[in-house]
Amino acid sequence: TTGILVGIGETRWDRIEALEAIATSHARYGHVQEVIVQNFLPKPGTAMHNAPACPPDEYLDAIALARVILPPEIHLQAPPNLSDDFGVLLDAGIDDWGGVSPVTTDHVNPERPWPALELLTSVTVERGFTVAPRLTAYPEFVCDPNRWFDKGLHFAVMDRSDAAGLGRDDPGAVFPEAIETVSAADGAEVRQVGSESTAWYSGAPVRPVHLV
């Protein structure tokens, strides 16, 4: 992952050169998953707290430049919480919203809350796209673990991803293990598994959920 910050005094040509440098590096190593194009917003207590925010038209132009200059396999990300009208970011060329969370704040920009997932999904679908969860690694990299991951990470990555390399929709996150020791009628102790547990076994009263 790499990226550029737009609106800190650089010129349009500076942005073009930065994006071309990223494209050149990727052509050599094939290692760039995504490029984040972020608009500068002044923050209190910093050296640039009085600097103007990045103009929206310059920001959208930078995103469009990135989409034209970078090869199509490099994903383009922009944070939705730093733009009041984040739908136009899709129009400009992004294909990823980044780490949007319904339970945590943006720790870098806590004053800018994430948009509700329902709104984010609605705006995305209106433009003909689909919202899907992913890991920190993109599907193209997840599906080629021998090249991109240390062997010690293979199980963890594959356990948390689906057949397409996206984030796995695992019912275990909703229904945690529910196992307790009880006494049977004959006095023997047995391990009783709850009806909503993710521990499946022969003769279970419920069928496993299809994850893939």
Question: PLM features: residue spans?
Answer:
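Radical SAM/AdoMet-radical enzyme domain recognition
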Residues: 1-2
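Glycine-rich beta-alpha junction loops
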Residues: 6-9, 39-41
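Auxiliary Fe-S-binding modules of radical SAM enzymes
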Residues: 16-212
